[in-house]
Amino acid sequence: MTPHESLMRLALEEAGAAIREAARVLGARRLTGCTLYVTLEPCPMCAGAMVMACLDRCYFGARDARQGCCESVYALPGDPAFYHRLPCVGGLMEEEAAALLRRFFQARRSTEEGGTP
């Protein structure tokens, strides 16, 4: 498994775990009344999970021109083909979010190359 595949697998597991934990805490399968705040625009799988969980809305910082599925590449959460739709608002503290992501990936690359973060 490549480092990218490993990171994607971890991200998907964490997103699913967060939704399951929220559902457990609320005692409900649907997360109506809940708002999600994330650093990076959700990918297709995460955007689909938001729709399936019936979240009320999502705010994200940095846009993802390659995989962003809230507005950059595709607006999955607003697609009328789905029973539940939710608004997504991007660009929330965008510069800060982008800087945070850059630092995260720089540290990750440093660790993968044998350095210290």
Go through the PLM ranges and name each one.
Residues I19-L26:
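Pre-active-site segment of Zn-dependent metallo-hydrolases
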Residues M1-G16, R29, M45-P117:
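Zinc-dependent deaminase
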Residues A28-E41:
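Immediate flanking context of iron-sulfur cluster ligation sites
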